A protein has these predicted regions:
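Disordered, acidic Ser/Thr/Pro-rich linker "stalks" and the adjacent N-terminal cap
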Residues: 2-86, 102-103, 182-187
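Generic hydrophobic, helix-prone segments enriched in Leu/Val/Ile
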Residues: 25-30, 61, 109, 129-131, ...
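Aromatic, loop-rich ligand-recognition surfaces of beta-strand-rich domains
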Residues: 58-122, 144-187
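Extracellular carbohydrate recognition and processing domains
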Residues: 122-146
Length: 187
């Protein structure tokens, strides 16, 4: 019998060719994430959030300053930035350029994807952790546990480095790596 014709997406590599590696993609937009349900006030420096995706490492978005403890003062599980990728993309890694008053002080950060097709702003529980770094400092790459198709990502800070009179994290730039669409094979 004759094998069925291949149903690979046009532009897929021929047998024996290596697929193109994942690479940086454009980020369509960003918004702050501080749900009231989680103890927040629905606002975490929203006016500065675009600086995390503006391509200028000298600018940044930062969390508010939290007192007493690095885990956001014990007030909430975390805060972060929601990234709009413009469409579903198969994400493999997220690179973060972070800074702290002391460059040796680490930040705990997670990469999450929404449970549904829309980015929830109601609670962090509506997002699934797909990668994390509990000792992030400087420029770090967080590889996702498995390549994940999603139109949105949440960069979620759960423990902040010390600053004067408290704790605060700064996010200078975010780069998202994804597999080129032409490399996806439809079975």
């Amino acid at each position: 019998s004759t094998p069925p014709p291949s149903s690979a997406v046009s532009g897929s590599p021929e047998p024996g060719e290596s697929p193109a590696p994942a690479g940086p993609i454009a980020i369509a937009g960003a918004s702050d994430f501080d749900p009231e349900t989680d103890g927040g006030n629905d606002e975490e420096n929203p006016d500065a959030v675009a600086k995390a995706i503006d391509g200028d490492p000298a600018t940044y978005w930062e969390t508010l300053r939290y007192k007493n403890r690095p885990n956001l003062g014990g007030l909430k599980p975390g805060v972060g930035v929601v990234l709009d990728l413009g469409e579903k993309r198969t994400v493999t890694a997220v690179e973060l350029m972070l800074s702290a008053d002391n460059p040796e002080d680490p930040t705990s950060v997670e990469i999450r994807v929404p449970e549904g097709s829309k980015p929830s702003t109601r609670t962090e529980a509506d997002w699934t952790v797909v990668g994390a770094n509990d000792a992030a400092k400087g420029t770090v790459t967080i590889e996702l546990d498995t390549p994940t198709e999603t139109p949105y990502l949440l960069v979620y800070f759960t423990k902040l480095p010390p600053t004067e009179n408290g704790y605060k994290a700064r996010l200078h730039e975010v780069t998202v790596d994804a597999i080129p669409d032409a490399e996806l094979v439809v079975e």
